[in-house]
């Protein structure tokens, strides 16, 4: 388990939301002063599949979810303070049973 991220200092934020799955997944893009691209958002109950271009690190900030990586059979649980990574040019499914999941996604270099 990692420490919960609470603040990102000196970053630019795109005000236009990234809206997926009819508004069930909503995020905003952040660029840090070091040039690192991230999204911060919420996921409502449901199961969603995402394809990745670049490798991603997902930090779960709040709520509970289960994740299944491309090519895997088993779902793994994640909660606040946990992290999972997804390869570039891959995919993952995420399920939220109840409540909201708050997350921070960091796009990592390939």
For each feature predicted by the language model, list its residue ranges.
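Ligand-binding loop in jelly-roll beta-barrel domains
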Residues: 87-110
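A short, N-terminal "cap"/entry segment at the start of jelly-roll beta-barrel domains
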Residues: 1-36
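Short hydrophobic/aromatic-rich beta-strand segments that constitute the beta-sheet cores
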Residues: 50, 67, 103-105
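Conserved short histidine dyad/triad with adjacent acidic residue
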Residues: 31-53, 83-88
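Short, conserved beta-strand element in jelly-roll/cupin
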Residues: 52-67
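Short acidic-glycine-tyrosine-enriched beta hairpin
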Residues: 72-89
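Acidic, Ser/Thr/Pro
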Residues: 4, 22, 27, 40-44, ...
């Amino acid at each position: 388990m990692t420490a919960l991220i609470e603040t990102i200092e000196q970053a630019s934020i795109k005000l236009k939301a990234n809206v997926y799955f009819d508004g069930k997944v909503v995020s905003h893009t952040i660029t840090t002063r070091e040039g690192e691209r991230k999204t911060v958002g919420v996921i409502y109950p449901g199961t969603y599949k995402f394809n990745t271009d670049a490798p991603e690190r997902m930090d779960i900030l709040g709520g509970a979810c289960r994740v299944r990586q491309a090519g895997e059979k088993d779902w793994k649980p994640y909660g606040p303070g946990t992290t999972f990574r997804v390869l570039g040019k891959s995919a993952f499914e995420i399920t939220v049973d109840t409540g909201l999941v708050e997350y921070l996604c960091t796009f990592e270099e390939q």
